[in-house]
Amino acid sequence: MNRLSYIFLPLTAIGMSACSSGKEEVKRPNIIFMMTDDHTTQAMSCYGGRFLQTPNMDRIANEGVRMDNCYAVNALSGPSRACILTGKFSHINGFTDNASTFDGNQQTFPKLLQAAGYQTSIVGKWHLITEPQGFDYWCILTGQHEQG
């Protein structure tokens, strides 16, 4: 065997084993995004609130990501939700007040999650008048647009 064979054979074996190995499944994190309405950080003990003890929320906050510096770009419920869903300011996403109708055809983070293979759902207050899009399952409170 010549010198080139000593180099070529091991490299070929390594290359073939790399090609034949199965693709390792990438572990994706579970994502639970909780959005509440009209309460301050004082309403949860994980943010230092003393009036209420919220041990289950505390556990979720301690084991996951707790957002400590979040600011609403619109003070109204519906428009604020539309901004969070789209990542766009109200004048760009078209939902400027609580009487607006949300255009669900635009890109939203639930649609991006679906495209990445996640199952998505929303339960509770929607407040965007139209039916939710980008969710595999939804169960929303109806009539929220009249409440302002």
Residue ranges and their predicted role:
Residues N2-F8, T12-G148:
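Formylglycine-dependent sulfatase
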